[in-house]
Amino acid sequence: MEIEFSGEILHWHGPSPFHFIVVPAAECATLKEEWSFASYGWGMIPVTAHIGDTAYTTSLFPKDGGYRVPVKDVVRDAEELDDGDVVPVLLRLRLPK
């Protein structure tokens, strides 16, 4: 199962700062309808994310009725990405073993 979209890299400046991309509403509807069976604790959904030439494992986390894709520092460094960049994202569902 795959979902593709483009999104902006945002920087959250909280007590534990991190970068993420907001999943668009239409794709969130698909996630809720078709991928929720794979959810674990607090609605997290395990995925392999592809940004540019970099693939990494992470989990989508629910926020404000939608989902966020965490973007690891190693991914941002490898792809030379900055806050505000709009990038194509491919998500593949990771099924529990």
What are these regions (language model features)?
Residues 1-64, 85-97:
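Long, compositionally biased stretches
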Residues 65-73:
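Short, structured beta-strand/loop micro-motifs enriched in basic residues and often containing a Trp
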Residues 35, 72-77:
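Short alpha-helix capping/helix-loop boundary micro-motifs
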